[in-house]
């Protein structure tokens, strides 16, 4: 999926407004995913999956960091996330559908905290960005 110049601008605008809360939103995204899609818990058997746990917060920070890295390298997301893609495909062997589920949960978290920010156009741009990130992270599975 190709991001237009307008999509890139919209995504940068969203992350410019949420970056101060990115770590918290990353943790909230994981909490939401584990609630809505409880089968995802199987990938984290060693985690305390209770809301606000230190492990959820730490992994949420990693999720947020990866998304910020993708935004900061929006013209080369594949290059920016190459090592992360290798890790998930070759070592962790995460089911590729999980990235889409995580992206959907992140979109909901942004909508909950910033409803006026997500105009239909911005929503579409952010969704395209998250789908692009998901595609990049699953590329090494082929």
UniProtKB/Swiss-Prot annotation:
<dbReference type="InterPro" id="IPR002338">
    <property type="entry name" value="Hemoglobin_a-typ"/>
</dbReference>
<dbReference type="GO" id="GO:0031720">
    <property type="term" value="F:haptoglobin binding"/>
</dbReference>
<comment type="similarity">
    <text>Belongs to the globin family.</text>
</comment>
<feature type="binding site">
    <location>
        <position position="59"/>
    </location>
    <ligand>
        <name>O2</name>
    </ligand>
</feature>
<protein>
    <recommendedName>
        <fullName>Hemoglobin subunit alpha-A</fullName>
    </recommendedName>
</protein>
<dbReference type="GO" id="GO:0042744">
    <property type="term" value="P:hydrogen peroxide catabolic process"/>
</dbReference>
<feature type="binding site" description="proximal binding residue">
    <location>
        <position position="88"/>
    </location>
    <ligand>
        <name>heme b</name>
    </ligand>
</feature>
<dbReference type="GO" id="GO:0043177">
    <property type="term" value="F:organic acid binding"/>
</dbReference>
<dbReference type="GO" id="GO:0005833">
    <property type="term" value="C:hemoglobin complex"/>
</dbReference>
<feature type="domain" description="Globin">
    <location>
        <begin position="2"/>
        <end position="142"/>
    </location>
</feature>
<dbReference type="InterPro" id="IPR050056">
    <property type="entry name" value="Hemoglobin_oxygen_transport"/>
</dbReference>
<keyword id="KW-0408">Iron</keyword>
<dbReference type="GO" id="GO:0020037">
    <property type="term" value="F:heme binding"/>
</dbReference>
<keyword id="KW-0813">Transport</keyword>
<keyword id="KW-0561">Oxygen transport</keyword>
<dbReference type="InterPro" id="IPR000971">
    <property type="entry name" value="Globin"/>
</dbReference>
<dbReference type="GO" id="GO:0004601">
    <property type="term" value="F:peroxidase activity"/>
</dbReference>
<dbReference type="GO" id="GO:0005344">
    <property type="term" value="F:oxygen carrier activity"/>
</dbReference>
<dbReference type="InterPro" id="IPR009050">
    <property type="entry name" value="Globin-like_sf"/>
</dbReference>
<keyword id="KW-0479">Metal-binding</keyword>
<dbReference type="GO" id="GO:0072562">
    <property type="term" value="C:blood microparticle"/>
</dbReference>
<comment type="function">
    <text>Involved in oxygen transport from the lung to the various peripheral tissues.</text>
</comment>
<dbReference type="InterPro" id="IPR012292">
    <property type="entry name" value="Globin/Proto"/>
</dbReference>
<dbReference type="GO" id="GO:0019825">
    <property type="term" value="F:oxygen binding"/>
</dbReference>
<dbReference type="GO" id="GO:0031838">
    <property type="term" value="C:haptoglobin-hemoglobin complex"/>
</dbReference>
<keyword id="KW-0349">Heme</keyword>
<dbReference type="GO" id="GO:0005506">
    <property type="term" value="F:iron ion binding"/>
</dbReference>
<dbReference type="Pfam" id="PF00042">
    <property type="entry name" value="Globin"/>
</dbReference>
<dbReference type="InterPro" id="IPR002339">
    <property type="entry name" value="Hemoglobin_pi"/>
</dbReference>
<comment type="subunit">
    <text>Heterotetramer of two alpha chains and two beta chains.</text>
</comment>
